[in-house]
Design a protein with these regions (language model features):
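Polar, S/T/G-rich
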Residues: 1-133, 200-336, 424-483, 492-493, ...
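Autoprocessing Asn-cyclization modules and mimics
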Residues: 38-45, 50-56, 133-195, 318-344, ...
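Conserved aromatic beta-strand anchor motif in extracellular beta-sandwich/beta-rich domains
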Residues: 78, 166, 374-378
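Short beta-strand-centered aromatic/proline hotspots
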Residues: 86-95, 171-178, 734-744
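Short, solvent-exposed secondary-structure boundary/capping segments
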Residues: 94-111, 179-192, 745-757
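A short beta-strand element within beta-rich, extracytoplasmic domains
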Residues: 348-368, 434, 726
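Solvent-exposed serine/threonine-rich low-complexity stretches and specific carbohydrate-binding patches
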Residues: 382-393
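Noncatalytic modules at the cell exterior or secretory-pathway interfaces
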Residues: 403-420
Length: 757
């Protein structure tokens, strides 16, 4: 037996003599294919000693103010003979009393990977702090409709369609062209020499920004925001022989006159690179940092994915009325996380609730010469709103308007709406109070967050955060994990290491160069073992949660098969496998796209489009849509512009495949092989999500001779301290993968579930 040591927040706790601590370790369990697991323990007890009472702040006494919060998990480390075994968190379940006195604290230990859900909580994608500023500097030359910066790097930072902000006077313009590293052409004359500027991610919602971003090359790193040819309502088609005013005929008639058909900017919406959402998650939560083993810029199956920003069905909504423009204050700074508040970007956070006693909260808003309405949101829910007339004076809000101190915790943002430009010199938020330390002592603090000068634009802005589809951050992450069969664990550098489980890549978890092999034959208890069927399912179904757009529904009706799905089993005419079905379902929408033909002569065009309507052809919101945007050319399309039209010769089409023909590549985001919507002749692309990311793992356990071997062994400490879940285990000359290990840390008794290879 060895010595077990448990540290909670770096303090060693007292253990009962001979207390048994049993740890279960698994990362991917064949009994629950779609989930990523982590280490956890059975409940065990700690004595109510003076040391432990101090750590848990006498939790049994509920009259203690500012005591231990058992709702949250706290950092912990398990050591064996002084050597680190596992790091993670403990959760206090209850306190056992004997004779009305505390006897034992009952806790459970969890591995570090569980932190992810603890950190992001119930936050949604629109709670994220996106990296809004793409570039900044000072204009060095006055030139009409130009932004010139002799020290600029526009060719690597700025995209056509981006919003440019004159910081000095609060005006905005859209980038029409990136002329060079030092110069941009804009759609408005807003800069003079020595004016400071910012290039921003969230664009102006107008014709110019949409038209420019419809023509970008999505494969270029700086083009994180694009516009695909996906309409929210209008049906697009191509017919060189007809001319119906206002409809979706994309045929280019030469522009102007009566040829007012085609696609308008209001028919379309922006899309954001999925990698930018991952970066926003890291930017929002300081405790989350992913490794680049999977989330990197050269993993194109991932990096080339975009999410369509379809927050609501139908047209984009950016303001409360036609003449009122909204602006989210995006310049918060200051604050101290240790004191409960933090200011950053478009939101400011209050990280914990405070006792009403001894704490005060106030918000001071400077005067403005323009009438406006201001709204205060907590976790995206409106808390308070008020309207101010021009030059009404500065004013202060407090708990009467914003709620009790004890309910302040959350992510806050402020939205200003007005019919004209609003200038407010500062919004100042002050949180004052008393902090109780673990020894009962107190200290006072003052925490101030400021916005600085606010200069709102009188333009409709497509705010990226506000336009994100409605999905929880944790559900989005889990969706990506299911999509690519990913695993995650916290590595020795305290980063969240994300990898594919088992595919052809050398970066795959099962294929890493540091995989070891342990022969445990001599440690196995030969008196007891068990051989189980490897897979308790007759089939595994892979699908998307939302297959309800018009063309996807039509596909199922025509072929009696859901679009892009896979049903894997080993059934045949002479063999019917017994068991239940297991479903791997992504929380995303999956569209079927359409390559247009010229209805006049039946010739294929180079146009492919998506239609976000339901079976009744009504605008459809659906789940978040992921797709590959591809810039294509060949057939010009007609883009409506202020009563006329522009000819666009290259444009972004949506695709489920990374390539438009199988000779270039067949990787796609269907689970099962489907006829590619664009390729001619009609070709089924085999590089599916199942084939690329699940095939090795699933087919191994579906083999007729696949087994799960359950056995007991008394493993030596050198193996217990060093094994990894991708290591091989050898028993009697046969090699196995680890499904799970349960280890009694006191006796070294280990119960192993092993999968045949």
């Amino acid at each position: 037996m060895q010595t077990i040591q448990l540290f909670i927040e770096n303090t060693r706790v007292d253990l009962f003599k001979d207390e048994s601590v049993t740890i279960t370790d698994t990362i991917k369990n064949i009994k629950d294919i779609s989930k990523v697991f982590t280490t956890f323990s059975q409940q065990f007890s700690l004595p109510a000693s003076s040391t432990n009472n101090l750590i848990f702040r006498h939790y049994y006494n509920y009259d203690i103010v500012n005591g231990f919060d058992a709702r949250a998990r706290v950092n912990a480390t398990i050591k064996l003979n002084g050597v680190d075994f596992k790091q993670g968190k403990i959760k206090l379940n209850n306190v056992a009393l004997k004779n009305n006195k505390p006897y034992a604290y009952k806790i459970v230990f969890y591995g570090k990977a569980v932190d992810l859900k603890d950190i992001v909580g119930e936050d949604k994608l629109n709670n994220l702090q996106f990296i809004e500023v793409k570039d900044s500097g000072t204009c060095t030359l006055t030139s009409a409709n130009k932004l010139t910066d002799f020290g600029g790097s526009f060719t690597t930072t700025t995209s056509e369609g981006d919003r440019v902000h004159n910081v000095d006077d609060g005006t905005y313009a859209t980038v029409l062209s990136v002329d060079s590293n030092q110069q941009l052409t804009l759609n408005a004359d807003i800069f003079a020499a020595n004016d400071d500027y910012r290039v921003l991610l969230s664009p102006i919602w107008e014709n110019d920004s949409v038209e420019e971003k419809l023509q970008l090359q999505p494969a270029t790193a700086k083009n994180t925001l694009i516009v695909p040819l996906i309409t929210h309502t209008k049906r697009l088609y191509y017919d060189s022989s007809t001319n119906i005013a206002g409809d979706g005929n994309l045929y280019w008639h030469g522009g102007g006159g009566t040829h007012d058909h085609g696609v308008a900017y209001t028919d379309l919406k922006f899309a954001l690179r999925v990698h930018s959402i991952i970066e926003a998650i890291e930017n929002t939560y300081s405790d989350i940092e992913f490794t680049t083993d999977f989330f990197n810029t050269t993993n194109y199956n991932y990096y080339n994915l975009y999410m369509w920003l379809n927050r609501k069905s139908g047209e984009v909504s950016t303001s409360t009325s036609v003449n009122s423009f909204q602006f989210t204050v995006d310049s918060w700074s200051g604050g101290d996380l240790n004191e409960g508040g933090a200011g950053l970007g478009s939101t400011y956070g209050i990280t914990s609730d405070f006792a009403d006693f001894g704490t005060s909260f106030s918000m001071s808003i400077a005067d403005s010469t323009t009438a406006y309405t201001i709204e205060f949101f907590k976790n995206q829910s409106l808390v308070y709103t008020t309207s101010r007339t021009a030059s009404q004076g500065a004013y202060t809000l407090g708990t009467a308007e914003l709620g009790a101190i004890s309910t302040m915790a959350g992510t806050w943002h402020v939205v200003i709406s007005a019919n004209a430009n609003v200038i407010i010199s500062n919004i100042s938020i002050t949180l004052q109070g008393i902090i109780f330390d673990e020894f009962g002592g107190t200290s006072s603090y003052t925490n101030t967050i400021t916005s600085g000068n606010i200069n709102t634009p009188a333009v409709a802005t497509f705010d990226i955060a506000d336009q994100m589809p409605e999905i929880k951050v944790i559900d989005f992450i889990n969706g990506l994990f299911k999509m690519f069969n990913l695993i995650a664990f916290v590595n020795d550098e305290d980063k969240i290491e994300v990898r594919t489980l088992d595919n052809a890549s050398s970066d795959s978890y099962y294929n890493l160069s540091n995989v070891n092999t342990y022969d445990i034959t001599e440690y196995v208890d030969v008196k007891e073992s068990q051989v189980d069927v490897a897979l308790p399912f007759k089939e595994v179904n892979f699908t998307y949660e939302d297959l309800k757009t018009f063309l996807a529904v039509n596909h199922e009706q025509l072929f009696n098969q859901s679009w892009g799905t896979e049903q894997w089993n080993e059934d045949s005419d002479t063999l019917r496998i017994d068991g239940q079905s297991y479903n791997v379902k992504l929380p995303f929408s999956h569209m079927k796209y359409e390559r247009l033909i010229n209805q006049d002569n039946g010739v294929d065009t180079s146009i492919q489009w998506g239609w976000s309507v339901n079976e009744n052809q009504d605008s459809y919101k659906g789940k978040p849509l992921l797709f590959y945007p591809l810039r294509n050319s060949g057939t010009p399309i007609q883009f409506l512009v202020n009563g006329g039209s522009d000819q666009i010769t290259q444009y972004i089409i949506p695709s489920n495949s990374r390539y438009l023909n199988d000779t270039s590549g067949e990787d796609n985001i269907n689970f099962g092989p489907e006829i590619n919507e664009y390729d001619r002749p009609l070709t089924s692309f085999s590089g599916t999500l199942f084939q690329n990311y699940y095939y090795n793992y699933i087919t191994n356990v579906f083999r007729f001779n696949a087994r799960i071997i359950k056995l007991t062994a008394y493993l030596p400490l050198r193996i217990i301290l060093n094994y990894k879940l991708n290591d091989y285990i050898v028993v009697s000359g046969k090699k196995y993968r680890i499904n799970s290990i349960k280890v009694n840390l006191l006796t070294n008794k280990s119960e192993l579930e092993l999968i045949t290879t």
